[in-house]
Amino acid sequence: MTLFILTETSAGYALLKAKDKKLLKRDDLATEASTAEGVSNLLKLKSFQKFDSATAALEEVASVVEGKVTPRLASLLDEIKDEKKVSLAVADPKLGNAIGKLPGLDISLIADSTTADIYRAIREHLPTLIPGLLPQDMSTMSLGLSHSLARHKLKFSPDKIDTMIVQAIGLLDDLDKELNNYAMRVKEWYGWHFPELAKILNDNIAYSRLVLKMGMRSNFENADLAEILPEEIEAAVKAAADRSMGTEISEDDLENIQALAEQVVGFSEYRSQLAGYITARMNAIAPNLTALVGDLVGARLIAHAGSLTNLSKSPASTLQILGAEKALFRALKTKHDTPKYGLIYHASLIGQATGKNKGKMARVLAAKASLGLRVDALAEWDDDVTEEDKAALGTEARFNLERKLAALEGKPLKPRGVAIGPDGASAQPGKFNINEARKYNPDADAVDQDKATPSKKMLVQEVQDEEMADADSDEEPAANGVDSDSSDEETSKKSKKSKGSEIEKLAEKAGLSVKRYKRKLERGEIQFDAAGNPSAISKKDIKKAKKEAKKEAKKASKGDDKEKKRKRSDETEDTDGKKKKKKRDD
């Protein structure tokens, strides 16, 4: 049986024919094939199919690795169809199974460990078996093909490098901390010279720019600050500079302060540039996630998970509480309620929701974000696909979530395409404004005075039913035309006033307000002496009285129990006596 050996190389497919039919069964195969002359004596080239380009080589080798037979390989195997009693040695068993399924190819396949020695010898001495193939060219082609194959396996793309996002968002957080520290140091340092400026101007960047431009506070009076400050704040700054209480500083001190202020301005400019870079990278790597939660929140989620692939493998429940691991494990340990959200809490959709709906929105948003993440991580797009098409899933999901949030909050539904701000209202990007710092208003101070609280009208009043007088009655109206009922009302009002004045006097004697006196009087906590002067019973006395009442109640209950026991014992004695009499009579 003729033996053929199929060899896949970086240059093409080679079909080798063994000169010895029992080559694989020889015991001295390894020693004889250790040299180039020995290999050339054992094998000869039957046919060679060369790859046309590097792209074709990548496609062919990738198909062979997956165990598929390409048209080029099938045409090479057609050359041994006509031969009878043919055996073919293949290095990959998966590829051997695929070749065995080809129609019209009646050959016996060998894809076991017996071919290991011969394939090792072929790889070592391949240039001697294929004429015109130099060792230098072979190594170059093998290196290029291995890189292309590895890139193909990893589906490598420069736009899919999520490491850049992880590093960038970490740098952004570090910049925020350093920028805040530097800005506070500038305010404290320059505050010795112009302390009023920090109270008027809140913005750190504008403060640093002002220090860089003006220097000494004496330069503020005739300077034009319209490029940095609005008119109102500019006037306030100039007025404060004229009557400032700060100390004088030297030019050397001012140079160092301005050097630090320059660092603050430079850091702020680089931070805005870095934020734009993160936005662009997030739109390229995870457009659906960016459409749902925003670029900064999405970047922090990717950085926390380690990579976009790891984040896409996480379920929605994990995505919802990502970043709150300490709180989660603490809640599980103490058997308390688990947290509802982690890093996703900072998304604008959750920020628009009120307290009762934040948990619902976090759960729904995490579910939609997990779907969008899988599309971002695993979808393969063509070159002609636009960015809008890539982010279509996230945009549609965000629109539906905004409508659901509006329905939960009871707000009117916004039409498609309307930007919704954190307060839930349609918003447009506004201009940057520097607001003046809030000041204490001394004119609003006032001395509290005792004001008589107006008596509240009773919502329900009692009305007494009175009998109507007959028409033929002899009663005549009063001379002034006023009925006798009016006089009764006047007398009742006078009596009420007199009662109210008496209660006020008694409350003053007891040292209580009228309200407290009435409450204590209703509870029975007011006692009167022999002269009729009231006094409030202290809480200690009330507690003692309650304890004594409880003790008396317990004693009474114990006495009742004793009487009941005595009655029972008397009854039992009577019944026993009756039984004894009956026995005597009998």
Curated annotation (Swiss-Prot):
<keyword id="KW-0698">rRNA processing</keyword>
<feature type="compositionally biased region" description="Acidic residues">
    <location>
        <begin position="464"/>
        <end position="477"/>
    </location>
</feature>
<feature type="region of interest" description="Disordered">
    <location>
        <begin position="464"/>
        <end position="586"/>
    </location>
</feature>
<dbReference type="GO" id="GO:0017069">
    <property type="term" value="F:snRNA binding"/>
</dbReference>
<dbReference type="GO" id="GO:0030515">
    <property type="term" value="F:snoRNA binding"/>
</dbReference>
<dbReference type="InterPro" id="IPR012974">
    <property type="entry name" value="NOP58/56_N"/>
</dbReference>
<dbReference type="Pfam" id="PF08156">
    <property type="entry name" value="NOP5NT"/>
</dbReference>
<dbReference type="InterPro" id="IPR012976">
    <property type="entry name" value="NOSIC"/>
</dbReference>
<dbReference type="GO" id="GO:0000480">
    <property type="term" value="P:endonucleolytic cleavage in 5'-ETS of tricistronic rRNA transcript (SSU-rRNA, 5.8S rRNA, LSU-rRNA)"/>
</dbReference>
<dbReference type="GO" id="GO:0005730">
    <property type="term" value="C:nucleolus"/>
</dbReference>
<dbReference type="GO" id="GO:0000494">
    <property type="term" value="P:box C/D sno(s)RNA 3'-end processing"/>
</dbReference>
<dbReference type="InterPro" id="IPR042239">
    <property type="entry name" value="Nop_C"/>
</dbReference>
<dbReference type="GO" id="GO:0000452">
    <property type="term" value="P:snoRNA guided rRNA 2'-O-methylation"/>
</dbReference>
<dbReference type="InterPro" id="IPR045056">
    <property type="entry name" value="Nop56/Nop58"/>
</dbReference>
<keyword id="KW-0539">Nucleus</keyword>
<feature type="domain" description="Nop">
    <location>
        <begin position="285"/>
        <end position="410"/>
    </location>
</feature>
<comment type="similarity">
    <text>Belongs to the NOP5/NOP56 family.</text>
</comment>
<dbReference type="InterPro" id="IPR002687">
    <property type="entry name" value="Nop_dom"/>
</dbReference>
<dbReference type="Pfam" id="PF01798">
    <property type="entry name" value="Nop"/>
</dbReference>
<keyword id="KW-0690">Ribosome biogenesis</keyword>
<dbReference type="InterPro" id="IPR036070">
    <property type="entry name" value="Nop_dom_sf"/>
</dbReference>
<dbReference type="GO" id="GO:0000472">
    <property type="term" value="P:endonucleolytic cleavage to generate mature 5'-end of SSU-rRNA from (SSU-rRNA, 5.8S rRNA, LSU-rRNA)"/>
</dbReference>
<dbReference type="GO" id="GO:0000447">
    <property type="term" value="P:endonucleolytic cleavage in ITS1 to separate SSU-rRNA from 5.8S rRNA and LSU-rRNA from tricistronic rRNA transcript (SSU-rRNA, 5.8S rRNA, LSU-rRNA)"/>
</dbReference>
<comment type="function">
    <text>Required for pre-18S rRNA processing. May bind microtubules.</text>
</comment>
<keyword id="KW-0687">Ribonucleoprotein</keyword>
<dbReference type="GO" id="GO:1902570">
    <property type="term" value="P:protein localization to nucleolus"/>
</dbReference>
<feature type="compositionally biased region" description="Basic and acidic residues">
    <location>
        <begin position="499"/>
        <end position="508"/>
    </location>
</feature>
<protein>
    <recommendedName>
        <fullName>Nucleolar protein 58</fullName>
    </recommendedName>
</protein>
<feature type="compositionally biased region" description="Basic and acidic residues">
    <location>
        <begin position="549"/>
        <end position="563"/>
    </location>
</feature>
<dbReference type="GO" id="GO:0031428">
    <property type="term" value="C:box C/D methylation guide snoRNP complex"/>
</dbReference>
<dbReference type="GO" id="GO:0032040">
    <property type="term" value="C:small-subunit processome"/>
</dbReference>
